[in-house]
Structures are given as C-alpha cells and as structure tokens.
C-alpha cells in the first residue's frame, strides 16, 4: 500500500466545529436584532414614519429564514460525514460571517439617523448575496 495516504476526517471534530459555528451565527443574529431594537428605543418617536416600520418588519422577518436556512445548510452539508464536504468549510464559514456581519450592520442602521435608501441598498446586497451563494 505504497501510495498517497487516505485523508480521514474526525467526525467529532467536524460536529463540534459546526456546533460552534451555529452558536457564533446565533450570536450574530441576536446582536443584529438587539441593534435594531436598541435603535428603535433610542430614536425620537416623532421621526418614525410608515416606511420605517415596514423596513423594520422586513428586517425582523428576514432574520428567521436566514438563520434557519444557514443552520440547516451546515447540518445537511457537513454532518452527513462525507469527506469531500469538509474541504469547503472555511469558505462557507467566511461567507456566513459576511452575511452575519451584514445583518448586524443593517440592524445598527435603525435609530435616529435612519436612512431608508441606505437600508434598502444593504438589504438588496444581502438578498443578492443569498442568491449567488
């Protein structure tokens, strides 16, 4: 058996990594929701207008599908114990981190200096990124 040794992946390490990544992503989305709530609480109420509430609703209803979809993606693609799936883990981790950071950024926009056009551009960027990735 002189040849290239077969690469083996430790399924416990992969499972632990996925669990840690899901916890990290959960924290990022919780921070995004917290930032949106904090912005609403800190902003003067006379600045609120129907478009603000509509965009806040769109943001909050976007968090759950993004969370559920990404967590399920990692379960389906990395916990099925196929060796080839572990090769792209770092790329998926990077992209998930970018999506999480974008959601936190969007949550932080709500508040006194809320700009609907800016929020809509970030929201469109998030949706395009979700479609492409």
Language model regions located:
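Membrane-helix interface/capping segments
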Residues: 67-84
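Physicochemical signature of membrane-embedded alpha-helices that form the seven-helix bundle of GPCRs
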Residues: 18-21, 53-57, 87, 91, ...
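Membrane-interfacial segments
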Residues: 41-45, 74-77, 110-111
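Membrane-proximal helix-loop-helix units in multi-pass membrane proteins
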Residues: 91-133
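N-terminal topogenic module of multi-pass integral membrane proteins
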Residues: 1-69
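Juxtamembrane helix-capping/reentrant segments at transmembrane boundaries
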Residues: 79-95
């Amino acid at each position: 058996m002189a040849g290239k040794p077969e690469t083996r992946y430790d399924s416990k390490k992969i499972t632990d990594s996925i669990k840690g990544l899901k916890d990290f992503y959960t924290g990022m989305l919780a921070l995004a929701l917290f930032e949106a709530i904090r912005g609403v609480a800190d902003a003067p109420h006379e600045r609120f207008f129907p478009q603000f509430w509509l965009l806040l609703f769109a943001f909050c209803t976007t968090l759950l599908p993004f969370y559920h979809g990404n967590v399920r993606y990692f379960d389906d693609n990395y916990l099925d114990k196929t060796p080839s799936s572990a090769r792209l883990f770092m790329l998926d981790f990077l992209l998930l981190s970018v999506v999480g950071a974008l959601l936190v950024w969007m949550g932080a926009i709500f508040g006194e200096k809320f700009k609907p056009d800016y929020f809509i551009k970030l929201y469109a960027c998030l949706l395009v990124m979700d479609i492409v990735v």
